[in-house]
């Protein structure tokens, strides 16, 4: 039955245009026999531009199809696969834990609040906070009352605390212990910060 359903889906690709069909065409090149090909019919197809963010509650099925993104997760002891993978899929566990709640794609996007060189992204849970910081030659202070992870999204960043100094290039990160806040930063580019608002 799976093969027949996939054959019917693939035959529809010839006569359908736009989304979700464009995404189904894309993923069928990599996973031609995967049940996950039906996912774009059930889920929102969201294209994020640089600097945009979205929030998904736990138990929400999602996939990253192309490009580069920074994912921040709350503390969790599991990841359940739903498709688009050669790995084992525990269907009974998946069905028991996934919540399907209809929502327009634009309601998934978070609208940042700009405060000087910082973009603060409101998160509707207490597990973490997220912000982006645009850097310049002007020294700025980054502080929080919790530990933090600083990730260099683009450009370069120099962090220092007292006599300690650290250079970050794109893709590199630093862990800042709660007792090390605040730190001073400058550079050219952008830092992402994940922390807790206490």
What does each model-found stretch correspond to?
Residues 1-18, 128-130, 169, 181, ...:
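N-terminal non-catalytic cap/leader segment that marks the start of a structured domain
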Residues 1-16, 27, 48-50, 58, ...:
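Non-heme Fe(II) oxygenase catalytic core, chiefly the N-lobe of the double-stranded beta-helix
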Residues 1-16, 86-106, 130-132:
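Transition-metal
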Residues 4, 17, 21-35, 66-68, ...:
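Glycine- and acidic-residue-biased ligand/ion/polar-headgroup-sensing regions
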Residues 43-55, 60-65, 70, 133, ...:
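Short acidic-glycine-tyrosine-enriched beta hairpin
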Residues 67-120:
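C-terminal, non-catalytic macromolecule-binding modules
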Residues 114-117, 126-144:
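Conserved short histidine dyad/triad with adjacent acidic residue
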Residues 154-198:
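Generic C-terminus detector
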